Each structure stands twice: as structure tokens, then as C-alpha cells.
């Protein structure tokens, strides 16, 4: 099973904040960073899914999955554009939707979305490393994502809204009304949801392949050596929290 080191988890978090600072405009960056600051401890360790054979069901899996989708969506957008597709959205809109399509998986203001599976039977027979938190009010993941964004006063464009809603494509029955319309007036006005869905699929399957390879991805990858005492202290604190929560 793939694992991330404490250094990788910290590095991925720093990269996530760098992406926000680089791609999100001044008009909503402060509110967005406030949300990420409030959720930092929970989000850094959140998994991307509940079952080992799905994708990134591990501490730190959520942030890594989001970073993969941001990267892949920009790459796929370039391929679409190169081959003649209409690109009528900004990179900021694409990155914003990629960043937040799974935001609902961090839970709400009080509760985690995933909690550790405490049933040995489910862990052994269903590969359930985590389970859904029964204390959490039910919402679909995109709906909770949009609710959290509005709670923090983060404005969302119509393209971002639809992109976040439709990233799961036809895997979500609720998306049929958008994706299977037989009236051209009701069709999508942008290719962004298709690009996001392809990026999500690509990330999910690659992460699943990494899980299958198992021991080949056990060793830490791309881990930076701390350059300052403050950075080393931050890593040491994170390791302590990592050990407390998961060992």
C-alpha cells in the first residue's frame, strides 16, 4: 500500500498553498486562504477515498489527489486547445474548480468526512481503511464543497460552479440533466467540465495503479531536506502529530 511520509505531506501542503497564491486572484484569495488555514490540520491528513483499492486512501491522500488534478487539468486543457477545442474559460477558473471539486471530502465545520474504520472485518474483507462519519449531515461531495465556499464568502463563477458539480461525470446520476440534454439550448456552454472529468479519471487510475504496485511506491519520493531550523521544527511537529494519529 502506498504511504506518504510526514515530509511529503508537509511538502504537498506547501505546494497547495503556492498554487492558490499563484492562480487565484486578489479578490477572493484572502477568504480562500482563511478557509485553508481553518482546515489545515484536518485537510493535510485527509484521505481521498475510503478503500485501499480505490485511490489515495491514506493520510495525505486528499491533498495529493487535488494536486494531481490541478496538474492534469492544465495539461489536458493544452491538448484540447492545441487540437482546436474552444477554450472560453480562464486558467484561474480551471484551477479553482480542480482545487475544490472534492472539497466536500474534508467534512463540515465540525466533523471529518472520513474516520478510521474500527471494524476489523470490514478492514480485512472489504479493504475499508476509512468509513463515512455518521455524525456528518449528508450532502453530496460537490454540494458540500460549494456550501463551504459560500460559508467563507468565496465567490464562484458559473463555469466554476458547473465544473465542480460535474467533475464526476456520469458516475453521478445527478449529472445526467447536464450531460445528456437533447435540447441544444440546455447543453454545456464550456468544455471545462469535460476537461476536469478527464483529469479526475486520469488521476484516479494512476493513483490506483500506484496502489497495485504496492512496495514499489513505499519509499518516500521527492522529499526535500529542510533548509532552516524553523522548517525542521515544522517537520518534527508534523511527524509527532502523524505518529499520534496513525501509529
Residue locations for each model-derived region?
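Divalent metal-dependent catalytic cores for phosphoryl transfer on phosphate-bearing substrates
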Residues: 55-58, 64, 76, 87-211
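Residue-level signal for secondary-structure boundary elements
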Residues: 24-28, 44, 172, 207-210, ...
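Generic detector of well-ordered alpha-helical segments enriched in charged/polar residues
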Residues: 10-21, 29-37, 161, 165, ...
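Acidic/His-rich, divalent-metal-binding segments that scaffold phosphate/diphosphate chemistry
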Residues: 1-124
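Acidic, carboxylate-rich catalytic segments that either coordinate divalent cations
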Residues: 181-247
Amino acid at each position: 500500500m502506498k504511504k506518504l511520509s510526514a515530509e511529503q505531506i508537509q511538502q504537498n501542503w506547501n505546494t497547495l498553498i503556492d498554487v492558490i497564491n499563484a492562480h487565484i486572484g486578489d479578490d477572493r484569495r484572502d477568504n480562500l486562504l482563511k478557509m485553508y488555514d481553518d482546515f489545515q490540520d484536518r485537510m493535510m491528513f485527509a484521505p481521498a477515498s475510503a478503500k485501499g483499492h480505490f485511490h489515495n486512501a491514506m493520510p495525505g491522500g486528499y491533498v495529493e489527489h487535488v494536486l494531481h488534478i490541478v496538474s492534469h487539468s492544465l495539461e489536458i486543457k493544452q491538448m484540447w486547445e492545441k487540437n482546436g477545442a474552444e477554450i472560453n474559460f480562464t486558467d484561474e477558473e480551471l484551477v479553482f474548480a480542480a482545487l475544490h471539486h472534492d472539497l466536500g471530502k474534508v467534512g463540515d465545520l465540525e466533523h471529518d468526512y472520513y474516520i478510521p474504520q474500527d471494524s476489523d472485518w470490514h478492514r480485512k474483507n472489504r479493504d475499508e481503511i476509512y468509513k463515512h462519519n455518521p455524525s456528518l449531515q449528508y450532502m453530496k461531495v460537490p454540494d458540500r464543497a460549494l456550501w463551504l465556499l459560500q460559508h467563507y464568502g468565496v465567490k464562484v463563477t458559473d463555469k466554476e460552479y458547473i465544473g465542480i458539480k460535474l467533475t464526476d461525470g456520469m458516475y453521478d446520476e445527478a449529472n445526467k440533466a447536464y450531460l445528456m440534454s437533447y435540447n441544444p439550448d440546455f447543453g454545456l456552454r464550456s468544455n471545462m467540465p469535460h476537461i476536469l472529468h478527464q483529469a479526475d479519471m486520469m488521476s484516479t487510475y494512476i493513483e490506483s495503479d500506484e496502489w497495485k504496485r504496492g512496495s514499489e511506491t513505499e519509499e518516500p519520493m521527492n522529499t526535500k531536506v529542510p533548509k532552516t531550523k524553523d522548517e525542521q521544527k515544522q517537520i518534527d511537529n508534523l511527524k509527532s502529530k502523524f505518529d499520534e494519529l496513525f501509529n
